[in-house]
Amino acid sequence: LKSSIKSDLILGILSDRIMSTKIMQKGRNNKNDQVEYLETPIKSEYDKKEYRAIRLPNGLEALLISDEDSKTCSSQHQDMKNEMKAACCLCVRTGTFKEPPGFSGISCFFEYLLMTEFEKHCLKYDIVKLTYKHGGSFKYLFDYDEYTLSFVIDIQEKHFLSVLIHFAEFFTNPFPEKEAFMQNRSNIKGEFQTALTLAKNRVPQPQLSSFTRTDHPINQIIEDRIIKEYENLDYTKLYEELHKFKKRHYSARRIKLVIQARLPLNTLEQYVTIDTCFVNIPTNKLSPDDSTKLIKNNVPFDSAAFHKMYKISSSKHVGQLKIAWVMPPLYALYKSKPYKYISWLIGNEEKGSLMSYLRKKMWNVSVSNEEICYNVHTTAYSLLKIDIDFSIEGKRHVKEVLDTIFSYINMLKQKGPQKNIYDDFSKTAENSFRYSEEKDPRDNVSNLCIHLYQYPSRDYLTGSKIYFEYDPKTITNILNYLTPETANIMIFDKNFDYLELDKVNSWSRVSYTDSEISQEWLEHWKSIEPLPDFHLPKNVNPYLGVQYFLEPLPAKVPKYPVKLYNDSISELWYRPDPKFRLPISHIYTHFISSVGLQSPENAALMTVYCNIIKLLVVEELYSVVAGGHSYDISVSEKGIITKISGSMPIVLLLNIIKYMIYPNVKKEMFETIRDQQVDIYSDIITEPEKLAEDVRLWIQKLVHYTYVDMHNALRNVSFEEFQNFAKCFTNRLYIQHLIQGNITQDAAIESMQQCFEALKCDSLHSSMMQPNRVFQIPLGTSYYKLKNINKCDPTSIVIDTYQIDITSIELSVLMKLIIMIMEKQLSLKFQSIQNDLIQHTSCNYTDVDGILTYSISVIQSLPNKSYTTELIKEWIDRFLEYFKDFLDELSENDLDDVKERLRIFKQHADMNIEEEINRNWNEIIKCQYIFDRYEREILALNNIKLNELREWFDKYTWNENYVKKLSIHVIGSDSAEAQSIALEYIIDEHQHKNIEENYIIKVEEYQKKLFVYPVTEG
């Protein structure tokens, strides 16, 4: 560092430790008397943070968040995990789509300049290096709906002010000098193209945006004339226009700021108001809102193109129906949120709902956490959207599905607004807000910064969450927007006739066709009566009236989960929550069975079984979830995992178990879900990255069924075979429980007993438990080459994997350090590539059932017959040679920086109880039970020396007596060959040239010669 920069950093650190330094006093005396204090945001009773909203003299509005209480909690309850990062988000709303004549797209270029100049500024003041060393990061975020660009930075608290000063300094004058700009004019055209691409990628609802009026600003960005305007560009004129644009649209009155740290509010205010910080951002007296008025007469989508039906090619087998209605911006209605009331009713999944009927007819059999009906709000317009996945049966009944949707909407119109339903919905939102878990500071500040544009200061926290007032008139008004003739209808499917799709979308480049919606259909949808199956939610949700209370803590709370019970059928781990103290408990359960590992048919049936359970419980548990509970059901290698949270999680668990034992499903429903899962497997194996990773695990593991195996096996599985599978699954089980949170030890034991009594299962015989085992890759290099299953995809990928040894704390920490160093160098090497040989690189280390490996992946996705996977492999080898030299030149100080970043990560305080639970759960399901793993890793980290890294890398990457390398090649193709779902092995000339290397032709034959590592699970 230069001496002046070093002085700034030292000054910053001292200022952070001593709250009354001269620089702070000066800023306080000069600026504080002009700071305007806004109304304090309303917060939840369980939120221990303190908030202050202020407006600086230049008009910039800031939200200050003091999290001092978490420092006390961390020191009391988690001695080791007490690191916390401070975070800052500055959000800029420039004049997006307010281009002057002759300079279309200049707003995009201006935002791009802000980003590139910020990067230069960070490099100049070593902010990148400083944030990296001290566990921090910086990134950009585009808000698609608010047309804003956010700059987010976080770092260890003791270094926060030193970085914040330099961070703020950039925004006082972010524009490059004319001389520097003109020197770079040879790159301007390319940079403008990059800026335009970024802007197109982040325009909200790109498919819909191409349907706006041709004279609407949103539509202008897709015009070819933008590029033409810049072909013979006068760069002096461009600079002048950019300068004018900055003067008009870059103003402190259009900038918002949020900072969060474990420091007093007064200190945070000093940080923001000192002379060197945000008070010097330029301002003007022009309205901060006029450049965001992108609509005329509130009708941006009035073109005939919007009100049509579109058939669009999809890359996925699962079809989808999307319906959208456009409305004027609805932010002003945030207190009553009528749009959310309507979207909640349309997306309701209880009996009598739209989704219940579609599932009954088997037109939809998907269950996910994604909303079925949702709202999109921008400064230009609002949308109400319905997204429904089609089953194979649903694709055959598109018209009937549309009839059903409009029938349900007509019922909502006939019934009108219902205050009791609104009140239930409001209580649900209040509970969710009251008991919401903490977010990471970086995520929190970036989310809240957008709220500063949308709500008055008192509602910064509550504006998007709480329902303040019931307004039946606005509900009726929005329902009246939902008419057939104003709807935009899109149908996505992979199996459309490509000859029928005669157009290409200018945004996404996908094929589509459009058609007018027949007048007969429109009239039918207007008058269709509600189906007799439909009714509104009938009763008040009983789970909303549950009284929440905190259980008393025992005199001594264990630092980690303790085992309360263990026998041949189950084990129970338990820990109360002394830190977060929310009236919520969590039950995680792993139902382990041997049946899923017995064949590819059973492995696939495990997923089908899980999907059927999710479908069966969704209606019954919907009201419980609305009452504040959450649940997740997923498949593991050994069985099924449930994760349940709420005030009474055992209620949900017992319901799930009921359907596990008796999955009362008809043959037609099973076949529909089975066929959909076959399609999902088909989509997965046509993605070359997933195919390569799947094959890599297949070769390494003693038992692993590939997606190809499961795809081919599942197609022929009968309903009777499924019934036998379901019965066998619950006959013999081993069950792992972890219970944490607001629950007593006795209640935890009782919950486990209720679970066992409901299942009435026998224990797994030891001979039936197949522990995960791994093959030892032979010395040298083993190659496996296969064709990309998607014959129209030119993407090729190479994954080179180096198998190391049985896992240990010391070895895993050393490898993590290596990968952290390698990631950065791999990224730099990738950026320096001058050709299009490679489009993506990554490196990783993996614990494959107790055996550690590290790997490098490289993707080539452009059609070029001269580029082979052998060239990619050679590039990887050259990189590893370079990396060896880099390690040899690495200094101890450089290593200390990486170690410090890893230490901060390991010691970062948990933001919510789920972070702790997930860490403990990972130990339990792996049967390792090292709950103090992070503490042990810190001890190991402190003892690792630079020479150990060098020796380790040389030994396992270059020493022929230790190198065990597996090289997977997936070869892309641009041919139009007929496709079949099978692994197609490739024999090429390299196998004959390198006879000393091991080319795998038949995996089973190759594995017969290999040693199998011993069991590594606890």
Positions of predicted regions on the chain:
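Glycine-centered hinge/linker elements that transmit conformational signals in sensory
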Residues: E269-D289, S751-H765
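C-terminal regions of mature proteins
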Residues: L14, I18-S44, V258-A261, N420-P578, ...
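Extracytoplasmic
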Residues: K49-Y51, P57, E83-A87, E146-T148, ...
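M16/MPP (pitrilysin/insulinase) zinc-metallopeptidase core fold and M16-derived inactive scaffolds
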Residues: T72-Q156, S162-V163, Q220-I226, N348-S368, ...
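Non-catalytic accessory/assembly modules
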Residues: E179-S186, Q193, K200-N201, Q205-S209, ...
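M16/insulysin-pitrilysin zinc metalloprotease superfamily fold
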Residues: T116-H121, V152-N187, L268, N348-E350, ...
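Active-site-adjacent "gating/activation" loops or surface patches in catalytic cores
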Residues: K71-C73, D79-K85, H317-V318, H377, ...
